[in-house]
């Protein structure tokens, strides 16, 4: 198939699945749009404002600001000069001191280090106003200053007088301190900086006295060099600074939000996309669907390309919507008002592509969906954190640091948003013409390139990890480059050599059991010394050991073995699912480790567990895999129709696989394996879970298809193996025990003949045994299970067989025999003997079982070992049963059991608990604090030389009057000075302010960079005014402008060589000043809280993993059915989760201590932090429990919860925080939103932490400034500092704590109502009002009923009260309708009674309604109509009382994988109320009786399917339940385990219990059931004991014979002719190659006579084996059933066929099958069962057609003790 066609097919698959997963698709598309809507909302609530031209007044610098005159000091300000050895400097400093009216103390320090030490350590350093440090080495104390003077002004680290209100508590608008590390603000805006401050505002050059001191020092220097001239100059000279005028502009407060919040919101919006992508890819990997597609011919690169195109197109839609929201103007504004729409789209699309590839990369590191999804989301968030390090120190970061940071796509995205916001602030927006403009050393173009580079790198990592590293699933790729590396080769074979020694000495002893290879057959599969070893930590498990065997074309090779023998491992190795540890396997000459791509083109695989897409229909699956295997479009449709017909799935063609029953899924899996003509078929238990009719259809299909194929089949059905297997191989503990044809194995392991007897309840076992031993003394009782007894009859006693059979037939009623039959050695017996020989411990264990031991000669059966499962199971020291706990004692015991379950989950999933619940929130906080603290250290104020060269080349406009009174050459000197400094002087005429306004309007983009300072020298009469004009957009322009005019004045006085260079070098930070960082710490608190909320979202969602997991596997339902109370179940979970929540809470406090985060680590704050966290846990955990009801799998639930909690936590906090900004003017809206969002625990948590942080920091700020409470609140402009942090008002946390405390009980109540189905019941009442009439019509449609069924219903109807009192279980007219678009009738007025010591069997095809009955009896599904009573209690109204009387084994194991088998039993024992002192004994006895002791203490996840079924059955039998419901209890068990379970169930029934069982095994029902009913389309078609049904519907015998295949063609026809001649009236019922099945009429024909005839025929016609039995229950079952529409799996789909049941015009009864018996049964039992008018479509054409006079078509009969018996075995019922 061409790659393009495969790609098209994969895209079709992906989009069909996305279309049918509506919620996930909507979430993926809308989550980014929702976050975009938040940004749009903020935009619409922060409208831009127009500002007119503004001129600012000049500021006199000759005097200190007024603040210093009123500053509250206990001592004088200090002026410090350095070095102190110079008297010259002291004189200069004293001149400075005399300049001002403030009283100063002049101090000198010898060195800078001593000065800094004084500042840091001495409390008196607070009074140091400034330190003046001259850069000159004075050789003597009187040495004068040089003409070139350089000095530092060292003001305090934190400004003293710039107490500007912390207007932006949550966003950083300006850098803290003197900002000497920056020339411009990091977030430079088009709007004027500090618009309302004439002196420029922050960093406070005027208010701090810097300009006054600078000018005073400059003036003192001038006086030092030219005392007289300087005095004369300054007499008529006034120097001032003046801010550049502001032109008309738009003041847009949203730009602050855009730059600070938009990157975070954009990242959070795409994190949901990343989670969904990762989860989608990993689900395919976890379910092995990905490897299955590879096996069917898919190339790896196509898989990734298809996924990329799928998510790319989804992202295209999402990004288009986001672009529209961002760029479309609403109310005259848009999020990006000025930017190019195309560029915004390209930018977002590049980020979306990078996110897709990031998800691809993360998916390659994991095998489990929910683990990979959670960790992928965490890592995605972590990659955003470096941006916080970059953004606040952008100008300090090197180009390499920025490039490396942009290797994280989230950082690159945030950098891109930064550029967009900067260009938006300039008023131009990002455009094609300016996208390459370098801002600092980076540009928007580089951001786009880095996003594309990130995508490539992520893709490369994904490719390398996918290709080169070994995985648990799939073959690791071998690249020759890495193959040269010895280390790589070593890793390829991680098996210890001693384990792989070839040539096991024991294999020589097994050679007798390995048949010679057949001659003349093509060897298609060759396995040579194959090993597979699995490692779990330090332990290892050899799954396959030295396996060598061949498989041949045209043959079916059957692989048998006990659960865990290694069958599935062999299949997985051959299909390439897992690599072999050592050895080789060749398929059609290709080695599996090297040529898997070629092999897969010819292999069809049906895995043990269905690998189906939940939302694909049957037709979709066949079409997809057919096309993938290379079928053309036309051929594919033809093959699909053919396959649907062959498999009997026509009516299921449009049903989604998730709604199909297990049997139908197995059919579909077989169809997928067969489609497109695969030459090699590997079928792993293909018929598991199928009903008898379906299984026979598959047998026919496989025999038809095997001609040119090689088939490897595994199974637990021995009859299937005997019938289909050309060769049979048996594995035990991974080793091959025997291999050969069925006849070869029977010959090697045979022990004679087997007689199977099915007893009636009145049978006298000892009397019956005496009769048998009388005829054959050497007979051995092989097993006794329930109603079944199996005797081994030695071959040498064969002459006595006829007399024995005649005697039993004549005395059948007297001896209490229901049916009996005999056969030669069966495959089941072969299997059991092989297992015993391979594992002697099995033999020892089974010898302990009374039903499996040889009966002693006196026929006495010991009874001391059969007490543990009946009513005296708890009577450990006496015959009196103990009392179960009740009331409060039971509640406490259940609470304890549920608490231990939670503890076990945490202990066994410690990695999950440690990573998600503990480390994740702590690591996020630690990383955030590390970034902020690192930033604080790196942003310490550094020395900055205040010269124009610092800002590069600028234009300096100046105005100097002609013939200035200062100096006629002033203009020339000024120009020369600027040129020498590398600047561009520009002399203008007229007003400098007007010139600047004009230039700012002409070129707004370049103005702030080109025009930093200006000067004006004006003469007014005899007075000169010098104005130093500065551009306030530059932090240090005021001092630069002053230095410029001071320097030109100095040059006028002292010559052209004179110059003064001033450096701003802040003092080191004192301990006191550390507390004055609120302006800087505010943004830190905001981002800290946002990051923390994200981590808490993951922590909170993790509490859903167990609850969703229990719900998905129905373990929770089983626990409730066992009797656990709602309070015990949920409150125990809440308690443990709160304890778990306390651990990260306390560790969080330690983290705050470690990082010295006083706001949270202060002694007064610690109780508040703990209280906030615990109340949040109290509220959020019940909410998570409640929401978890909506999820089906833990992985998807965790993903959706993270998305939901992130959105509902961060979005409200951001909205309330942003709208609370004073500049926006929406404080009332903020308060309203704050109160609305109190219903969300995440919002309460975030706001409580925010207020706790800001309140503490503001209090520190005000205390440092010595401000009173009133003054502090005035400065804060509306923020009220709370002395009591628990206050309700602004910056208090009281209302949030109160809300959290109230939300806890509210959500708990909501949880209990949800658990009690209160909302479902309400919905049902409301919807039932409208559809009641339709349902009544549907339920009134009934088919013809059998007389026994009618009699049972009438008896219940008229004697209901009596039956309720006497019978443990009474079901009256129980009905179930699934209310879909087309109402589906699953159960139609079923009535039956089950008495004590009865085992009632429900038989029927897949979907007949059996499980629906169980679901109603256990209240897993609501009852549509009817009633059911258990011990007199109605399950509709008294379910809480009913629970204590019911034991339940569900169809699919509801076991908790993280617990051991023993722990599961102990937990359910506590739930049942067994006293603690008896639990251990009780559990030990059950484990011993079911042979579970070996693996009782192993985790359930290590159990095989069969062992899980044993454990599920044990749970159902535990605790003395009166009514036990077993839904297919023995499915998937090997024969040994199956017999043990039958034995246990039989003895439980004998003890007086009531059992209801469903099964697809007729032998199981024959062995266990005292009464049974056959269901067809929701109705009972017959009801009664097995013997009663056989008496009514059939008589005669069933003959099965198998001709040796060597003489198959020659002798088969002769034998058929012999039967027709010898038994007149016989009919051929079934034929499968060498096996035939006949119906023999019972008139004048004795069983013993038939046996005698067949013994002779065995010799004459070379029969391999044969069996004779009375007519079986399976014959009757098949007569009532045929392939019919499956009701159960179409619950969600609704079948059109049922439409007719709603139509009054349609008179055909919905539940009456075409093959149902007549509505009026005959007055006397018919001589034979009713036949079907036609055979199933899967029957081979070679079979004789059935005629109306013939008996029903019957399958090969089997050993009655097991559904896995060979065809030679009688089926006795």
Swiss-Prot record:
Any GO CC annotation of this UniProt entry: intracellular membrane-bounded organelle
Biased amino acid composition, Low complexity: 1700-1710
Top-level taxon of origin: Eukaryota
Binding residues annotated for ATP, in chain numbering: 561-568, 1404-1411
Residue spans of biased composition, Pro residues class: 1711-1740, 1763-1773
Keyword annotations: ATP-binding, Cytoplasm, Endoplasmic reticulum, Glycoprotein, Lipid metabolism, Lipid transport, Membrane, Nucleotide-binding, Repeat, Transmembrane, Transmembrane helix, Transport
Transmembrane annotation, as ranges: 22-42, 262-282, 306-326, 342-362, 372-392, 403-423, 444-464, 912-932, 1088-1108, 1134-1154, 1166-1186, 1198-1218, 1236-1256, 1293-1313
Single annotated GO MF: ABC-type transporter activity
Glycan attachment residues as annotated in the record: 340, 615, 1340
Listed GO biological process terms: lipid transport; neutral lipid metabolic process
Pfam families: ABC2_membrane_3 (PF12698), ABC_tran (PF00005), R1_ABCA1 (PF23321)
Membrane topology of this protein: Multi-pass membrane protein
Region described as Disordered: spans on this chain: 1690-1773
Compartments where located: Endoplasmic reticulum membrane; Cytoplasm
All residue ranges annotated as the ABC transporter domain in the record: 525-758, 1369-1602
Similarity comment text for this entry: Belongs to the ABC transporter superfamily. ABCA family.
Protein name per Swiss-Prot or TrEMBL: ATP-binding cassette sub-family A member 17
Provenance organism: Rattus norvegicus
Gene behind this protein: Abca17
């Amino acid at each position: 198939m061409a790659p393009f066609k495969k790609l098209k097919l994969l895209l079709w698959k992906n989009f069909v699945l996305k279309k049918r997963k509506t919620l996930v698709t909507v979430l993926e598309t809308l989550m980014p749009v929702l976050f975009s809507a938040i940004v749009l909302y903020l935009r619409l609530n922060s409208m831009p404002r127009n500002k007119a031209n503004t001129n600012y007044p000049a500021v006199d610098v000759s005097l200190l600001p007024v603040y210093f005159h009123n500053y509250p000091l206990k001592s004088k300000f200090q002026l410090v000069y350095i070095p102190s050895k110079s008297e010259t400097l002291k004189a200069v400093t004293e001149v400075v001191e005399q300049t001002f009216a403030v009283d100063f103390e002049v101090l000198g320090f010898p060195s800078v280090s001593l000065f800094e030490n004084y500042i840091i350590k001495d409390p008196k350093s607070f009074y140091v106003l400034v330190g003046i440090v001259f850069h000159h080495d004075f050789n003597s104390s009187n040495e004068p200053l040089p003409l070139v003077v350089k000095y530092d002004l060292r003001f305090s680290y934190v400004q003293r007088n710039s107490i500007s209100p912390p207007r932006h508590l949550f966003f950083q608008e300006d850098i803290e301190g003197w900002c000497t590390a920056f020339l411009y603000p990091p977030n430079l805006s088009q709007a004027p900086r500090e618009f309302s401050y004439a002196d420029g505002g922050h960093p406070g050059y005027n208010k701090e006295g810097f300009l006054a001191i600078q000018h005073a020092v400059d003036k003192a220097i001038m006086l030092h060099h030219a005392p007289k001239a300087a005095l004369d100059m300054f007499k008529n000279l006034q120097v001032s600074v003046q801010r550049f005028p502001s032109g008309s502009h738009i003041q847009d407060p949203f730009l602050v939000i855009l730059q600070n919040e938009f990157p975070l919101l954009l990242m959070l919006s795409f994190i949901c996309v990343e989670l969904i992508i990762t989860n989608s890819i990993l689900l395919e990997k976890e379910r092995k669907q990905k490897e299955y597609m590879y096996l069917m011919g898919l190339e790896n690169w196509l898989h990734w390309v298809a996924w990329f195109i799928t998510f790319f197109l989804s992202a295209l839609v999402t990004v288009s919507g986001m672009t529209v929201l961002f760029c479309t103007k609403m109310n005259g504004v848009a999020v990006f008002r000025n930017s190019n729409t195309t560029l915004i789209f390209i930018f977002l699309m590049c980020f979306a592509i990078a996110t897709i590839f990031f998800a691809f990369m993360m998916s390659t590191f994991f095998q489990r969906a929910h683990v990979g999804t959670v960790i992928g989301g965490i890592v995605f968030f972590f990659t955003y954190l470096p941006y916080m390090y970059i953004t606040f120190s952008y100008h300090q970061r090197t180009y390499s640091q920025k490039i490396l940071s942009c290797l994280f796509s989230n950082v690159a995205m945030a950098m891109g948003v930064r550029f967009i916001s900067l260009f938006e602030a300039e008023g131009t927006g990002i455009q094609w013409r300016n996208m390459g403009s370098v801002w600092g050393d980076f540009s928007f173009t580089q951001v786009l390139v880095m996003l594309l580079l990130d995508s490539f790198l992520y893709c490369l990592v994904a490719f390398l990890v996918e290709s080169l590293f070994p995985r648990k699933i799939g073959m690791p790729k071998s690249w020759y480059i890495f193959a040269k590396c010895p280390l790589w080769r070593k890793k390829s074979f991680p098996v210890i050599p001693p384990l792989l020694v070839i040539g096991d000495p024991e294999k020589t002893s097994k050679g007798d059991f390995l048949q010679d290879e057949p001659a003349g057959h093509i060897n298609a599969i060759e396995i040579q010394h194959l090993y597979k070893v699995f490692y779990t930590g330090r332990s290892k498990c050899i799954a396959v050991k030295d396996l060598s065997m061949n498989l041949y074309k045209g043959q079916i090779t059957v692989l048998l073995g006990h659960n865990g023998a290694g069958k599935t491992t062999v299949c997985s190795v051959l299909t390439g699912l897992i690599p072999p540890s050592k050895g080789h396997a060749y398929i059609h000459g290709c080695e599996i480790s090297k040529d898997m791509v070629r092999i897969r083109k010819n292999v069809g695989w049906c895995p043990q567990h269905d690998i189906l897409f939940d939302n694909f229909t049957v037709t979709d699956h066949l079409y997809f895999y057919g096309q993938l295997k290379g079928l053309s479009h036309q051929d594919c449709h033809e093959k699909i129709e053919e396959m649907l017909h062959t498999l009997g799935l026509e009516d299921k063609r449009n049903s989604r696989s998730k709604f199909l029953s297990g049997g139908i899924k197995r059919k579909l899996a077989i169809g997928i394996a067969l489609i497109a003509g695969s030459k090699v078929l590997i079928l792993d238990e293909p018929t598991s879970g199928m009903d008898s009719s379906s299984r026979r259809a598959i047998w026919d299909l496989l025999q038809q298809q095997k001609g040119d194929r090689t088939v490897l089949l595994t199974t637990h059905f021995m009859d299937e193996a005997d019938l289909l297997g050309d060769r049979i191989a048996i594995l035990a503990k991974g080793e091959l025990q025997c291999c050969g044809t069925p006849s070869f194995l029977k010959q090697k392991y045979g022990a004679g003949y087997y007689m199977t007897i099915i007893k009636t309840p009145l049978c006298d076992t000892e009397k019956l045994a005496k009769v048998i031993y009388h005829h054959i003394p050497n007979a051995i009782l092989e097993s006794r299970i329930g109603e079944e007894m199996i005797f081994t009859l030695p071959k040498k006693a064969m002459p006595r067989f006829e007399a024995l059979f005649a005697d039993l037939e004549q005395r059948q009623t007297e001896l209490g025999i229901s049916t009996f039959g005999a056969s030669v050695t069966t495959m089941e017996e072969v299997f059991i003997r092989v297992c015993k020989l391979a594992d002697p411990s099995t033999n020892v264990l089974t010898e302990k079982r009374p039903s499996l031991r040889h009966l002693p000669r006196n026929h006495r059966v010991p009874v001391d070992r059969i007490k543990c499962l009946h009513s005296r199971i708890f009577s450990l020291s006496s015959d009196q049963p103990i009392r179960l706990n009740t009331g409060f004692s039971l509640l406490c015991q259940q609470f304890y059991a549920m608490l231990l379950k939670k503890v076990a989950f945490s202990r066994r999933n410690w990695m999950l608990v440690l990573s998600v619940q503990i480390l994740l929130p702590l690591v996020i906080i630690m990383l955030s604090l590390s970034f902020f603290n690192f930033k604080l250290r790196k942003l310490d104020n550094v020395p900055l030389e205040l010269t124009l060269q610092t800002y590069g080349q600028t234009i300096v406009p100046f105005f100097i009057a002609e013939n200035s009174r200062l100096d006629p050459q002033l203009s020339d000197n000024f120009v020369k000075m600027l040129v020498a400094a590398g600047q561009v002087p520009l002399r203008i005429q007229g007003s400098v302010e007007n010139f600047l306004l004009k230039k700012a309007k002409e070129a707004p983009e370049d103005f702030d960079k080109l025009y930093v300072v200006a000067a004006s020298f004006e003469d007014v009469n005899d007075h000169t005014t010098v104005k130093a004009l500065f551009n306030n957009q530059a932090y240090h322009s005021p001092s630069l402008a002053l230095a410029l005019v001071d320097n030109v004045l100095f040059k006028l006085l002292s010559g052209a060589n004179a110059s003064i260079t001033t450096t701003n070098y802040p003092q080191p930070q004192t301990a006191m000043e550390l507390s004055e960082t609120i302006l800087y710490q505010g943004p830190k608190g905001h981002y800290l809280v946002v990051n923390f909320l994200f981590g808490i979202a993951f922590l909170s969602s993790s509490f859903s993993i167990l609850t969703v997991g229990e719900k998905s596997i129905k373990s929770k339902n089983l626990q409730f059915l066992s009797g656990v109370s709602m309070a015990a179940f949920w409150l125990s979970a809440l308690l443990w989760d709160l304890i778990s929540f306390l651990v990260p809470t306390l560790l969080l406090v330690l983290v705050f201590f470690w990082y010295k985060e006083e706001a949270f680590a202060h002694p007064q704050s610690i109780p508040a932090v703990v209280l906030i966290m615990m109340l949040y846990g109290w509220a959020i955990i019940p909410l998570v429990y409640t929401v978890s009801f909506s999820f089906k799998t833990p992985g998807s639930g965790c993903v959706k919860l993270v998305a939901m909690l992130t959105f509902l936590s961060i979005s409200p906090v951001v909205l309330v925080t942003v709208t609370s900004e004073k500049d926006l003017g929406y404080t009332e809206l903020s308060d309203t939103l704050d109160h609305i969002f109190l219903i969300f625990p995440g919002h309460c948590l975030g706001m409580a932490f925010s207020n706790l942080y800001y309140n503490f920091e503001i209090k520190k700020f005000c205390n440092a400034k010595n401000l009173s409470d009133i003054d502090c609140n005035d400065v804060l402009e509306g923020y009220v500092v709370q002395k009591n942090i628990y206050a309700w008002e602004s910056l208090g946390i009281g209302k949030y704590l109160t809300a959290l405390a109230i939300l806890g009980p509210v959500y708990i109540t909501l949880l209990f109502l949800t658990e009690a189905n209160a909302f479902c019941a309400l919905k049902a009442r409301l919807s039932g009002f409208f559809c009641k009439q339709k349902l009544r019509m549907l339920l009134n449609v009934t088919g013809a009923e059998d007389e026994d069924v009618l009699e049972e219903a009438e008896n219940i109807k008229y004697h209901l009260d009596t039956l309720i009192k006497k019978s443990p279980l009474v079901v009256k007219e129980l009905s179930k309708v699934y209310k879909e678009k087309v109402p589906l009738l699953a159960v139609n007025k079923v009535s039956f009674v089950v008495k004590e010591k009865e085992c009632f069997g429900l038989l029927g095809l897949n979907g007949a309604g059996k499980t629906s009955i169980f679901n109603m009896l256990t209240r897993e599904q609501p009852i549509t109509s009817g009633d059911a009573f258990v011990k007199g209690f109605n399950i509709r109204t008294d379910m809480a009382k009913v629970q204590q009387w019911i034991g339940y084994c569900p169809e699919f194991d509801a076991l908790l994988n993280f617990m051991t088998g023993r722990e599961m039993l102990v937990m359910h024992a506590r739930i049942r109320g067994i006293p603690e002192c008896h639990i251990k004994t009780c559990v030990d006895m059950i484990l011993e009786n079911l042979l579970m002791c070996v693996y009782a203490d192993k985790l359930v996840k290590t159990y095989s399917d069969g062992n899980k079924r044993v454990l599920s059955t044990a749970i159902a039998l535990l605790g003395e339940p009166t009514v036990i419901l077993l839904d297919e209890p023995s499915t998937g068990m090997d024969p040994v385990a199956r017999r043990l379970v039958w034995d246990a169930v039989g003895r439980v029934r004998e003890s007086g219990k009531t059992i209801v069982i469903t099964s697809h095994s007729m032998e199981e029902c024959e062995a266990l059931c005292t009464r049974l009913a056959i269901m067809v389309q929701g109705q009972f078609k017959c009801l009664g004991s097995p013997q009663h049904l056989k008496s009514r519907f059939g008589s005669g015998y069933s003959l099965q014979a198998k001709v040796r295949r060597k003489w198959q063609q020659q002798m088969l026809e002769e034998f058929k002719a012999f039967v027709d001649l010898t038994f007149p009236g016989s009919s051929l019922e079934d034929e499968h190659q060498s096996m035939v099945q006949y119906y023999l009429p019972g008139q004048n024909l004795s069983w013993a006579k038939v046996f005698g005839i067949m013994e002779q025929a065995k010799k004459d016609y070379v029969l391999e084996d044969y069996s004779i039995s009375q007519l079986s229950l399976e014959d009757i079952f098949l007569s009532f059933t045929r392939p019919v529409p499956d009701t159960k799996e179409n619950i969600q789909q609704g079948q059109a066929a049922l439409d007719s049941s709603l139509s009054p015009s349609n008179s055909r009864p919905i539940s009456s099958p075409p093959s149902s018996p007549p509505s009026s049964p005959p007055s006397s039992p018919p001589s034979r069962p009713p036949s079907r008018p036609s055979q199933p479509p899967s029957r081979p054409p070679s079979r004789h057609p059935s005629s109306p006079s013939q008996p029903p078509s019957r399958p090969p009969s089997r050993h009655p003790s097991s559904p896995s018996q060979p065809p030679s075995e009688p089926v006795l019922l």
